[in-house]
């Protein structure tokens, strides 16, 4: 079983296609990570206003989760269309995305991990960090990194 990381981007879609071309008809788990909104922070008396209420935060989390489910369904459909026997896994990000990917790959005992690369410049990679770069450097199993389409 391989782990296909999917975020809904064109690069992730391309990665699924390339992975199937290279790896063939193997079982796959499509992984989509979602981030809940930041925890509710009470208003600061110095500012004097409250930006988000707990109810608004809950509603926002619900909208984000709904979108995450749609993205996952899309990824599973793309993987199955490409020829994989795919199932989906939606995971709330508690740690960094790269750590979540590696933890799930370990849990599933994935043969390999497939990620798309955004193609960050050297400066962007230092400032923003790169998920694919971190996965490659910390993985204990093969990682296929598919670059973004030019």
Question: Where do the model's predicted regions map?
Answer:
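Structural beta-alpha unit
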Residues: 74-113
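A short acidic, glycine-rich active-site loop
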Residues: 51-70
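Conserved beta-strand positions in the Rossmann-like core of class I SAM-dependent methyltransferases
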Residues: 29, 87, 144
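Glycine-rich, Arg-bearing micro-motifs that act as flexible, cationic patches
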Residues: 98, 112-137, 148
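Residue-level recognition of beta-strand->loop/alpha-helix junctions
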Residues: 32, 90-92, 147
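Small/aliphatic-rich secondary-structure junction motif
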Residues: 1-55, 84
